[in-house]
Amino acid sequence: MALRTIDALDLAGKRVFIRVDFNVPLDPQGKVTDDARIRAALPTIRHAIQAKAKVILASHLGRPKGKPDDRTKLTLEPAAVRLSELLSQDVILADDCVGDGVKKLVRDLKDGHVLLLENLRFHPEEEKNDEAFARELASLADVWVNDAFGTAHRAHASTAGMAKFVKEKAAGFLVQKEVEYLGKALGSPARPFVAIVGGAKVSDKIKVLENLIAKADAVCVGGAMAYTFLKAQGVPVGRSLVEEDKLELARQILERAEARKVDLLLPVDHVCGAEPKETAERVVVNDRAIPDGLMGLDIGPKTLDRYRQRIAGAKTVFWNGPMGLFEQKPWSEGTFGVAKAMAASPAVTVVGGGDSAAAVEQAGLVDKMKHVSTGGGASLEFIEGRELPGVKACEE
């Protein structure tokens, strides 16, 4: 099934409901501290404005729990202010996302003007994909557009449920870009295709690893999950984090990679500390084995060099998961080293959301990558080969 996109629709004079992802971080004063998600939605919003649509935007923010101060702490007002600055035009903020007041605002909305509905999750029915709530949202729209890739793996009322009750539906440009880049990286990559996989737990990445082993030419493993693989090979790992109940699974993954003739690379040296703290002494262990009393907290310099060489020789590079405890400076070189190597590569470089995207952002290298996914859980599920409800709803 092909993805129908917003540019295939006539939007003039229509009520165009765009599900965006404005789940942005706020400081204690309620100011947006990182507007990347708002900026990511701009091409779709601008297209609808220029097409003279009545633009209705909807998003969630945080996880409201029905507390009295949720309405002030988790309001979308800061997002409305920032969006207004980015668009250089007024953005009307509704005080709810359903109800008579909202219907009146939609009725009075002029072509080319923008209305942002209040936080969808102030209504528990949103996450329950409640049919009556989905119908109520749908009553505001002639056209439904999903541009929130970050929530595309959730079957919520606004991300999937309401699509059944709106005649015209499409993906926004952000969802289209995500599906194209992630789909191409995994479906028909230019080869050699090198995958870099990190993170703390093998259990979080089982399906991702299995899918990548079926498609990649080489998989470079870092992060704490590497110690489970090393222990599965009989290598001492000191006090490193190990999932004891996943050792057999790690062996099976190693065997599968060997059977498929995929190079599965594990660290050959480590940056260690006595504990995972910024103040711990940084010890470079020039060996696969980690001594007792130390724990691996980052890949070592030799390992980083090996991974750099693989990246340099690749035509497609996909990265998901940090190489170490990169939030703390002593253990950040592996992660930022991978980011820099990818930035310097002419290959198609795709970063699969979550912590890797945060690291690329922190390193100021977003513009040097072909694509940095905005979806953490959504990009993981896409890589696992699962169907995303928010994407399926946009198919013709």
From Swiss-Prot:
Group of enzyme by EC: transferase
Keyword Transferase on entry: yes
A GO biological process held by the record: glycolytic process
Gene Ontology cellular component terms for the protein in this record: cytosol
Keyword Phosphoprotein on entry: no
Broad class of the protein's primary localization: cytoplasm
Name of the protein: Phosphoglycerate kinase
Lineage: Bacteria, Pseudomonadati, Myxococcota, Myxococcia, Myxococcales
